Curated annotation (Swiss-Prot):
Single GO biological process annotation from the record: isoleucyl-tRNA aminoacylation
A GO cellular component annotation in the UniProt record: cytoplasm
Name this polypeptide is given: Isoleucine--tRNA ligase
EC number: 6.1.1.5
């Protein structure tokens, strides 16, 4: 054997071993650093969606980071210079505060205040980096080629200062305002939430739904039927709302009169009488008596008003309105200029001692209020109503709608621009553009920005007691106002900054809000660069960024806020392309969560599964479709792509080393198989590039799976004799050259997805660079593509696969020759020589449809025939048993009819099926429109030839175990039993030729290796012939 040019994969080496070896190589040779510095002719701007490192990275994070890495590696290999190839860390907000509260055992905001904001925030600051080392370790193991040396961190003063600059800009352009209004509110966290936060926390729940009667003022026995799913709001009732255009009826029921929407009356009442009909606007202005007489209603309340939001789809068509606890209700109260009635504190408990439910959490009081209504004759009907209700997306508490002072960004005023900029974005999957994301833009609400919390970017607004407002846009402005800039811009230090109001001379104090943490991550495009205070970000060239990706919930989270801020600030979409990723479920298809105990942490799982195998699994199927974390699927996908490609390489390396082959460029292909594979290689490059460019990475995996399968199970199997030839001929060198090119090309195509094994193969094949990731993505040579040849060979492979499948079904091994194979369909005759090399058949024939050895069976299709034949159906069905199935088939072809017992039957009335005719002894299967028939009758001669092939296989295995070269000659001793003796007698020459055997000795001898073949056991010994 020649000196080894191509390293052999050590026996027992796993994919995990290879991945670890390459990771060490990258570290030892600073490969990532060289990737980061790689220049390019095209610009690609990356943006990392910042995680919070106060929790461990789970398996879903590993998938997201894999996809980011694929994009980075592919664009690096295709000549792009990657800008901003660094990570980011989200550091503020409720997620961090809640973990801190859990650590300290705090239950309310008061606990934090009593403990001390400074100490609490100090803990929060430290906690956000608790697992940062684990995150970076996972990034390294999974192969995420990101530069952590330049990570942006949202808690840094520079980041906060950039946000202040933008907030001041938004304020000065009239898009940031303060209002007292009803907002989504979490009573556990004691803070309001934005619409995009609320959108992430909806759950389907069953709440009590009640129909209650409000007595019309001044009437004897007349009531309004009002409906609500929040009985706890009834003590705060101020109005009843009707739709001005809906028809209402005054009905009589059980000696009482009721106003109700005409279309809903029959749902609420039975056996009622309609007294009068009117439109909703005719009810406006009517007064009614207070339902629950505990609180003092404000002047102007307790009357019927109109509102377009009322419908008659459900309920009664009359809505009870408590302006303190509903957005529409609040607007009604504001329109009617009536103060709100709010007996609920910020903890979500009734706080007015006059109420029987004082001190209770409002939602927990629902049932007690219903009992009160029933006992006092105020309840008409109650039931459970299933609807979607918002919960706090962080602490899982049901939200309230609650009146507060808050600062808002006027997103509604730029809604049209948001929609317009969305049209410039490429979405994957594309239905998000006008679906989940686009619909949210169409209804974009003003952004509730302020949070009455502690750990976050401080809202930079100062106010004096005369209500003069000053927005600060930089640290320098604080100095200009005569104050000292604290070293840390967070609370409580920023709260201590006070200055003189330039308008009135009074002291200005900061309003004690922090901002929505989503504004932090949504500012990453510019704040990460300390814009505009450092000259390293130019919106005209650095926006939009090229690509972002995160989980599906971020379409209404990070994706949304990026889009809003960029549109308002720069009048541009924030990103060109966005890929949304669905969830990794557990093996049973359940969503993972800590509470269920089925969470899988990335670092733990990567100790069990090779990173390349896991990465490949992540892209086995579209990433926007959920997939179960199934180890069997991971192993199967890895086997089909990675293991098979490694086996192909092993075959190449072993044989190339024997023959001293050295790749010096692709040789001119003369063999049909070489021409086909070279054509396939170039088609593979084109299709893979297209899939990568379209962000269809799962399609790259499918294409690679098909290519590796073609390479291993078709090209290599049909070409192996060329590699085993004794002499190093021109044909053999061409085969080596073609196989080398196929392995190298496949490695480069797979490099972004399977970075470790691809680099292992690249280095083993002596690629020209230190790493495959410093090389370029392969370019296709379209002149080498022969679509007709590919089509023919694809058909040949399809036939070969079908024959293999039939053999497996009828338990005839591939080494056992069969008498005949028949092919029927649109078959290219030129494939026959190729097919014959692999299917081990004495004869292959193409036959017409009529010549197929089939038996036709015919029966009635009862669903269509029975209604027509009626009482004759059984007699016709019996008569069909005596009719030739083929004749029936021919009769109904092309719209014809079959006459049976004076009935004319059409093809739609018949079930005509075919099975192989048992008289001929064939088994059948079909693929891609080609019928394949394998004759399963084996005669004596064919049977003996099959045994001879079994002997050859065992001798070849023994040669391999002895590490013999293919050129080494051997002597063989066989102790046969039964039919094996006849097989040796008849096929001795064949056995000797196939095994490089000089002498074949039959009979018992010492040191025989026992082999079980079928039901027999034979002994074989081989010995290398030493040249004299």
């Amino acid at each position: 054997m020649q000196a080894q040019r191509y390293r052999l994969i050590e026996q027992g080496n796993t994919i995990m071993d290879i991945d670890n070896e390459i990771l060490r190589y990258w570290n030892d040779h600073a490969i990532n650093e060289k990737i980061f510095k790689k220049e390019g002719t095209k610009k690609f701007v990356f943006l990392e969606g910042p995680p919070t490192a106060n929790g461990r990275p789970h398996i879903g994070h590993a998938m997201t980071r894999t996809i980011k890495d694929i994009v980075l590696r592919y664009n690096t290999m295709t000549g792009h210079k990657i800008y901003r190839r660094y990570g980011g860390w989200d550091c503020h907000g409720l997620p961090v505060e809640l973990e801190a509260e859990k650590y300290f055992g705090f239950k309310t905001k008061s606990d934090i205040i009593n403990y001390g904001v400074e100490k609490f925030n100090s803990y929060c600051r430290d906690s956000v980096f608790r697992y940062i080392d684990e995150w970076k370790t996972v990034d390294q193991i999974i192969g995420f080629s990101i530069d952590h040396s330049g990570d942006y961190i949202t808690l840094r003063n520079e980041y906060i200062e950039s946000e202040w600059y933008v907030l001041k800009y938004i304020y000065e352009n009239g898009l940031l305002y303060k209002d007292y209004t009803v907002v989504p509110y979490c009573p556990r966290c004691e803070t309001s939430l934005s619409s995009h936060e609320v959108a992430q926390g909806y759950k389907d729940v069953k709440d009590p739904s009640v129909y209650v009667r409000f007595k019309e003022k001044g009437s004897e026995n007349t009531y309004f039927v009002a409906w609500t799913t929040t009985p706890w709001t009834l003590p705060s009732n101020e109005f009843l709302v009707v739709n001005p255009d809906i028809e209402y009826s005054l009905i009589e029921y059980n000696n009482a009169k009721y106003y109700v929407a005409s279309s809903r009356a029959q749902y609420i009442f039975k056996d009622f009488k309609v007294l009068k009909k009117m439109k909703g606007f005719e009810l406006a202005g009517k007064g009614y008596e207070q339902l629950l007489p505990f609180l003092d209603p404000p002047a102007g309340a307790l009357r019927v008003v109109t509102g377009d939001f009322v419908t008659d789809i459900d309920g009664s068509g009359i809505v009870h309105a408590a302006p303190a606890f509903g957005s529409d209700d609040y607007q009604i109260g504001k329109r009617e200029n009536v103060p709100i009635l709010n007996p609920v504190d910020k903890n979500g408990r009734f706080s007015d001692e006059r109420l029987p439910w004082y001190g209770k959490k409002v939602r927990e009081a629902n049932e007690d209020i219903i009992v009160y209504l029933k006992n006092n004759g105020l309840l008409i009907k109650s039931e459970k109503y299933e609807h979607s209700y918002p919960f706090c997306y962080r602490c899982d508490t049901p939200l309230l709608y609650y009146p507060l002072d808050a600062w808002f960004i006027r997103v509604s005023s730029v809604r049209d621009k948001l929609v317009e900029n969305n049209e410039k974005i490429r979405w994957k999957p594309d239905y998000l553009k006008h679906g989940r994301f686009g619909n949210f833009l169409d209804e974009a609400k003003d952004w509730n920005l302020s949070r009455d919390r502690f750990w976050g970017t401080p809202l930079p607004v100062w106010r004096c007691r005369n209500n003069h407002v000053r927005f600060i846009g930089s640290r320098k402005e604080i100095e200009e106002m005569g104050a000292t800039v604290p070293q840390d811009l967070h609370r409580p230090y920023i709260d201590e900054v006070k200055f003189v109001c330039p308008d009135c001379g009074e002291e200005m104090r900061r309003e004690p809000y922090v901002i929505d943490t989503w504004f932090d991550s949504g500012s990453a495009t510019y704040a990460a660069m300390h814009y505009p205070f450092e000259d390293n970000f130019d919106p005209s060239s650095d926006l939009p960024v090229s690509f972002i990706t995160e989980a599906i919930d971020q379409t209404r989270g990070w994706f949304y806020v990026l889009h809003v801020i960029s549109t308002i600030m720069f009048n541009k979409n924030a990103y060109d392309s966005a890929l949304s990723i669905s969830f990794i479920l557990d093996e049973q298809g359940r969503k993972m969560s800590k509470s269920k105990g089925n969470s899988v942490f990335a670092l733990d799982y990567l100790k069990q599964v090779a990173p390349d195998s896991l990465r490949l699994f992540f892209l086995y199927g579209a990433p926007w479709k959920s997939k179960n974390l199934d180890r069997k699927i991971i192993d199967e996908v890895s086997r089909r792509v990675i293991s098979t490609l490694l086996n192909v390489y092993s075959f190449f390396a072993y044989n190339a080393n024997i023959d001293g082959f050295e790749f010096k460029g692709i040789l001119e292909a003369k063999d049909t198989l070489d021409k086909w594979l070279i054509s396939k290689i170039n088609t593979f490059i084109i299709e893979s590039r297209r899939a990568y460019d379209d962000l269809d990475f799962h399609e790259v995996v499918r294409l690679s799976m098909d290519f590796v399968d073609n390479l291993s199970n078709f090209y290599l199997r049909l070409s192996r004799r060329r590699f085993w030839a004794e002499d190093v001929t021109e044909d053999k060198l061409a085969a080596y050259s073609t196989l080398y090119t196929a392995i190298m090309t496949c490695s480069k195509v797979l490099a972004p997805i399977v970075p470790f094994v691809s680099d292992y193969l690249y280095l083993s094949l002596h690629g020209p660079y230190e790493s495959i990731h410093l090389d370029s993505f392969p370019e296709p040579d379209t002149s080498k593509i022969d679509h007709d040849l590919e089509k023919r060979m694809d058909q040949a492979y399809s036939v070969i696969e079908t024959v293999r499948r039939i053999r497996q079904e009828i338990n005839i091994k591939g080494r056992q020759p069969v008498k005949e194979i028949l092919l029927s369909g649109n078959i290219d005759p030129e494939i026959i020589p190729v097919v014959s090399q692999e299917v081990n058949a004495k004869e292959i024939r193409i036959v017409s449809s009529e010549q197929r050895p089939l038996k036709y069976t015919v029966d009635l299709k009862m669903e269509t025939a029975a209604p027509i034949l009626r009482s004759s159906v059984n007699s016709v069905r019996e008569a069909l048993k005596s009719i030739d199935g083929k004749a029936a088939f021919d009769a109904v072809q092309n719209g014809g009819k079959l006459r049976v017992l004076d009935h004319e039957l059409t093809g739609e009335m018949l079930n005509i099926s075919t099975i192989p005719d048992p008289d001929y002894g064939y088994s059948r299967d079909e693929k891609n429109g080609i019928d394949v028939f394998v004759n399963k009758r084996i005669d004596r001669n064919e049977y003996l030839e099959g045994l001879a092939r079994e002997i050859v296989r065992r001798i070849q295995l023994m040669r391999k175990e002895m590490n013999l070269d293919y050129t080494d000659r051997i002597n063989v001793w066989i102790d046969p039993v039964g039919d094996f003796s006849d097989a040796i007698d008849k096929f001795e020459s064949y056995i000797k030729a196939e095994t490089q055997c000089d002498s074949l000795n039959v009979g018992h001898t010492d040191d025989l290796r026992k082999w079980e073949i079928g039901d027999e056991t034979i002994g074989i010994r081989i010995e290398k012939v030493v040249p004299k």
